[in-house]
Amino acid sequence: MQRFSNILLVHEGRPRGRKACDRAIDLASRNKARLKLLEVAEPLPSSGVKYQAPDGELDLQTLVEREIVTKLAQKAEELSGDGLVVESKALFGDAFLEIMREVHHGQHDLVLLTAEGDGGIKEHLFGSLSRHLLRKCPCPVWVVRPARRKKSIRVLAAVNPTETHPSARNLDRTVLEMASSLARMYSGQLDIVHVWQQAPRSGRVHRNVVAKWNAELLLAAEQRVTEMLDHFDFSDLGPRIHLPGGPTGMRIVEVAEERKVDVLVMGTLSRSGLQGMFMGNTAESVLQHIDASVLAVKPEGFESPVKFDS
């Protein structure tokens, strides 16, 4: 995946963050990219109590800040090596705003973080921070499912070739490029899904007629995907193509579950080229139900609604 040059890893100090850390190190090393560890902590309420330190009396907030900065710098030094120099930065405040501020001022082109939940039947994988970043971060965001890292992974690319706007086609191209790069990088397998909209059922139309319409819609979907894939050489990957009909978000999740997907690569806006803060219904539905890591990309021209002074 030779496209990232300045990667930001939102550091998770617990063991569950190891997988995201490993992915960030891999990407930075392969891309000869810069890598920065960022940890954001909430400020402590002021108590007025002072504590004795070697250089004088300090309040609890200052002591905590020093400890976080020191431990993060040590972690960055441990991860550095073989030509990779890892930087570190500790910030204090609202996690979402501080991450967005760092992306803006640091000109990062990829953010990695560990999903807040553990996934599975009883728990959503993506929490408030993940969702906010997926909606509003101007660069690609990779939210990593906290699970044991595998040497080989299965990657699912979700595309929509029915969109004819140039920025939509570029978005699909980016999704396919990233997904195929990941599959090759980790000796994995590539699946591609396009969900087509079925003809609506109606009591006034015979079911055989509806079935004929759906057969024609499926054929058209096959042709669109074939034409799109003609621009790529995936012969080494032998991707499996999925063309389910129905509600887009749920069909993507069903394919991901059936194929035991590790990473879903998808665009996050319903209308490419749209500027603003809202993800499309498809992306929202996927994030509510998916139990895999998600690498989300924005279309060209996307502008984050969160602004900072230069």
Regions found by a protein language model. Give the residues of each.
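Charged docking surfaces used in two-component/phosphorelay signaling
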Residues: 90-99, 243-251
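A short acidic, glycine-rich active-site loop
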Residues: 56-70, 164, 211-223
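Gly/Ser-rich helix-loop-strand patches that form or flank binding pockets
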Residues: 3-5, 23-26, 30, 99-151, ...
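Short, hinge-like loop/turn segments at secondary-structure boundaries
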Residues: 53-56, 106, 130, 158-161, ...
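Glycine/small-residue-rich hydrophobic helix-like segments
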Residues: 204-263
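Small/aliphatic-rich secondary-structure junction motif
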Residues: 2-56, 154-208, 231, 289, ...
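A short helix-to-beta-strand connector/capping loop
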Residues: 79-87, 234-240
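General small-molecule cofactor/ligand-binding pocket signal
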Residues: 36-38, 87-91, 142, 191-193, ...
